[in-house]
Amino acid sequence: MSDKEYTSTLHLPKTDFQMKANLPNKEPKYIKKWTEEKIYEKGLEKNKNGETFILHDGPPYANGNTHIGHALNKILKDIILKYKTFRGFRSPYVPGWDTHGLPIELQVVKEVGVGKAREMSALEIRKLCEKYAKKWVGIQKEQFIRLGVLGDWDNPYLTLDPRFEAKQLELFGEIYVNGYIFKGLKPVYWSPATETALAEAEIEYYDHVSPSIYVRMQANKDLLDKIGFNEDVYVLIWTTTPWTLPANVAICLNENFDYGLYKTEKGNLILAKDLAESAFKDIGIENFELIKEFKGKDLEYTTYKHPFLERTGLIILGDHVTADAGTGAVHTAPGHGQDDYVVGLAYKLPVISPIDHRGCLTEEAGDLFKGLVYSEANKAIIKHLTETGHILKMQEISHSYPHDWRSKTPVIFRATEQWFIRMEGGDLREKTLKVIDKINFIPSWGKNRIGSMMETRPDWCISRQRVWGVPIPIFYNDETNEEIFHKEILDRICDLVREHGSNIWVEKSPEELIGEELLVKYNLKGLKLRKETNIMDVWFDSGSSHRGVLEVWEGLHRPCDLYLEGSDQHRGWFHTSLLTSVASTGDSPYKSVLTHGFVNDGEGKKMSKSLGNTVSPEDVIKVYGADILRLWCGSVDYRDDVRISDNIVKQMSEAYRRIRNTARYILGNSYDFNPKTDKVAYKDMLEIDKWALNKLEVLKRSVTESYDKYEFYNLFQGIHYFAAIDMSAFYLDIIKDRLYTEKKDSVARRAAQTVMYEVLMTLTKMVAPILSFTAEEIWESLPAETRESESIFLADWYVNNDEYLKPELDEKWQQIIKLRKEVNKKLEKARQGENKIIGNSLDAKVSLYTEDNTLKEFIKENLELLKIVFIVSDLEVVDSADGNYTDAEEIEKLKIKIAHADGEKCERCWKYDELGTDSEHPTLCPRCAAVLK
């Protein structure tokens, strides 16, 4: 037989599993399979009697395409739920969307035109908003499905779903009845750009340039008498919001600070002693003399003149006055600041807020300034105060200032009548902090973060002055302005909304909504009634999902097991969900909270379109496939901010290729293996096979532990090392000769195939939650009789096998691996240069010399094994070494020589040996000749 004919006697690899992944084209096929074959539903059915694990989906906003942060979030959730399903948990996934709110309403107004929108009714706007939201839900849904996320995509939850809205109204009613909801005139964040109140979670901070002014306010006689001084005296204040001075009704001091009366060229000025030097330097006052000193509390209840209005201001005391900056005398306008409002309550100060919804000053600000936008009012007030001698210094400063997160424009504090959930006073804060202690936070610092936010958060403003949202279900007696709330009436509203949706609130009159029977029962018949026109904050919408979803969708329950979102949700969805839950039922809606960081570019910079450093999921999928994106999600330590760039994605692609090649090699060499008939018992395996199974067993336990702890980045490192190093670079390389050249059904060959089968089945399950498409492709490439289920996602998790754990093999095989590395380095050199000795390793004879007797004995005892491991034709240990030996790099006292092997090359296995021992096969080595008998 010729060399070519002998090739046909080898058991060469056969598989349809391609080396080139071609994921962008293949992946849609598997999405189609999972959808048509209802794999998600079958997974639930398979585990119907198992313990439930509920991960509740935080709803993304239905506006615009998904971004890389969405992809990270959805894939992390999918990894967890697929793993839990493998482990026998019944793990439903109901995806959701946040569908009300200002961004959608603004987009609709923009599309129809501001002028036309103003002519439209609230109902018309609402219908357009619903259509717009549903359009983006459809688009985003397809984008999420393309990521390989399994879930109940045909029945997602939308916050505009009538069932959800009805539950939200019920929740509002419970919190109202519990005494935590009230209506009050309070300063709130207000966006003039979008003409509505904002919650804290809707505020972002950016650098902003503001005027910084020192203003002197003239003291009245009672203050002069208090300090025993009969010349003109001024209290010096500092502010960066001159437009709020029309609302000034007090100056706040710290009762424990030392204040001084200073004689200066700018008049006799009162300010805190600790701040006097810095303030005078800032103003440019070089000569000053301390005339008198006193405590802040000594001036309480004295008065001063407003600088441009006929108003007397009061000197008051407050703990919020610090010595960090300014003068220690704080301009106080309860209508324009939270601290001012709180201290104003104690002194029964009027809440004046002379600014309208567009940011224009009203008549209350005085004739000089009414009608001016607040930014223009700043200039006009500064000009007037300069002319009247009240301003001592004006300059511009850049500082961090609150902005509307949607319009990116500065916000103001404005006192308006709003609906609030009460945090100041009452027991909600204390109750919530106690509940937080019982929640498991991952990472653990999340507990302190949400706790510290809860300790300091003000009353939550839950009303918005827009049309697209869930109505606040309150009626009024229009003549007395008295609130009308009865649980029976609310129950009827909930029933109507559940049947018709929240548009019914806009469509029907108060009388129609309440109904004849309840009008009579509560003595409302004949009264002129009106409905509340404000809607609820969208954070109340999403914060109601523990009721609107977990109590409504079949198979879900509260508290759920896990909320998983970005770390910004400590002040967002985690926060609002917790507050609404504690305020209604006194408990948490979730047992555990897992947070991930933000996605930055490759250099750690925040992504922005203007910088051109954004990475879109769609672009990654088009070029590399969703599995590469999934692998990135599974490889990063998501607990901190993570990075992505084209280079990082390429690195992921390389790591993926190594895992894929390992799978392909095993599939190619398992084509004739049936585990039911060909499996070899552990006791009959070679030692190297047992070493491989020990490595696999250690990895199995490590991977399971990492999945249980949600530490996917740890398991990825382990899987990648096992596949690329332990398997491809070592074990699979060494057993190639056995697989190709031994008899088809020999114990040696079948043992290697048994190990490979175990490795592949286990490895496929390990990677399936992350590399979902590739795992399914591997599963499909297995012979049908070896697959335990129609889809990898209907299989059971692997079972640990204590028999495979052989830690005693580790030390020996670590030494063997070290020797192989040293020999491989020398073999590589022998292949190179003009005087190359060998073409491949089977051409080689390796000679080893060592003065280390322990090492020498080790090599002698394992000589035949090492020859197989080194993949060489001959190996010897010598007692002396000449100049042709070179030192090993990392093993002391070891010298190595590479020579060409003696004998002739076997035409079948390519090893050098004594040929011609078999007349029928004169060009084969004795082993190959025997195999062919």
UniProtKB/Swiss-Prot annotation:
Pfam families named in the record: Anticodon_1, tRNA-synt_1, zf-FPG_IleRS
Family, per entry: Belongs to the class-I aminoacyl-tRNA synthetase family. IleS type 1 subfamily.
Swiss-Prot/TrEMBL cofactor(s): Zn(2+)
Record keywords, A-Z: Aminoacyl-tRNA synthetase, ATP-binding, Cytoplasm, Ligase, Metal-binding, Nucleotide-binding, Protein biosynthesis, Zinc
GO molecular function, one term: zinc ion binding
Organism this protein belongs to: Fusobacterium nucleatum subsp. nucleatum (strain ATCC 25586 / DSM 15643 / BCRC 10681 / CIP 101130 / JCM 8532 / KCTC 2640 / LMG 13131 / VPI 4355)
Quaternary structure annotation from Swiss-Prot or TrEMBL: Monomer.
Residues annotated for ATP binding in this entry: K609
Reactions it catalyzes: tRNA(Ile) + L-isoleucine + ATP = L-isoleucyl-tRNA(Ile) + AMP + diphosphate
Protein name from the UniProt record: Isoleucine--tRNA ligase
Annotated L-isoleucyl-5'-AMP binding sites: E565
Job description of the protein: Catalyzes the attachment of isoleucine to tRNA(Ile). As IleRS can inadvertently accommodate and process structurally similar amino acids such as valine, to avoid such errors it has two additional distinct tRNA(Ile)-dependent editing activities. One activity is designated as 'pretransfer' editing and involves the hydrolysis of activated Val-AMP. The other activity is designated 'posttransfer' editing and involves deacylation of mischarged Val-tRNA(Ile).
Residues spanned by motif 'HIGH' region: 60-70
Enzyme class: ligase
Domain note: IleRS has two distinct active sites: one for aminoacylation and one for editing. The misactivated valine is translocated from the active site to the editing site, which sterically excludes the correctly activated isoleucine. The single editing site contains two valyl binding pockets, one specific for each substrate (Val-AMP or Val-tRNA(Ile)).
Disulphide bridges: none
Signal peptide limits: none
